[in-house]
């Protein structure tokens, strides 16, 4: 009861909860006022604004060393045309150049939804065994591609929707989240088509895929520290690898 009474009466406005990188990017593309002076009903904190600028700099969308540090770079202008999270947009731009758009659209849409793989507390071993067919020894990101291909093979040869749903549940997969993943992928496909970009017809290599991924995940890089099991990331952040990761 005490915990309930201490909770806020209303959820914080979205502008206060989400990354401001997208907001800053759109405002600059539309040549609106700087976010610091824009008359928001609930203005974001200075820390949140600084983090948003830092992410855009990390993605190469702005260049603080240029004559106009507040202006968008060519990469920034391209990102502003993609109505997705700037990190995902940066991966997609890099995938276009690395000729791995086919795989990246699958991965980017997967990262936009909750993981479709269920791992119930009372069926950890069984679910892990079922999901092992999608695993990739070199990359968890590529596991999404394997799962995607498996799922669409089942859809292609399904006898009925009811039987497909039953099969997915025996494999500890969420039919609803798989559908959501499919829908977002379709949206990204339409977006890429509007830009006139071509999907690669030959399978991309792990190197191509990961070079594209890294362009949007620079802040997530880390190296193994001297402390057993610990890694050191950007801004001296210490982190651990999830027990379920290989």
Annotate each PLM feature:
Residues 1-246:
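Second RecA-like catalytic domain
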């Amino acid at each position: 009861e005490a915990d309930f009474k201490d909770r806020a009466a209303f959820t914080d406005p979205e502008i206060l909860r989400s990354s401001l990188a997208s907001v800053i990017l759109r405002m600059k593309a539309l040549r609106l006022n700087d976010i610091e002076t824009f008359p928001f009903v609930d203005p974001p904190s200075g820390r949140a604004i600084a983090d948003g600028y830092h992410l855009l700099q990390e993605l190469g969308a702005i260049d603080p060393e240029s004559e106009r540090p507040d202006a968008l770079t060519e990469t920034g202008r391209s990102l502003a045309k993609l109505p997705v999270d700037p990190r995902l947009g940066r991966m997609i731009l890099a995938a276009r150049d690395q000729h791995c758009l086919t795989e990246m659209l699958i991965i980017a849409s997967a990262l936009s939804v909750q993981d479709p793989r269920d791992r119930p507390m009372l069926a950890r071993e069984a679910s892990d065994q079922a999901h092992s067919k999608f695993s990739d020894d070199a990359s968890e990101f590529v596991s999404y591609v394997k799962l995607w291909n498996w799922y669409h093979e089942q859809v292609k040869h399904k006898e009925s929707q009811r039987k497909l749903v039953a099969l997915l549940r025996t494999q500890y997969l969420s039919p609803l989240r798989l559908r959501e993943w499919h829908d977002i992928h379709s949206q990204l496909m339409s977006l890429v088509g509007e830009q006139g970009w071509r999907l690669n017809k030959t399978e991309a290599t792990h190197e191509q895929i990961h070079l594209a991924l890294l362009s949007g995940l620079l802040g997530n890089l880390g190296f193994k520290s001297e402390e057993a099991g610990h890694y050191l990331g950007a801004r001296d952040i210490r982190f651990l690898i999830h027990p379920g990761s290989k």
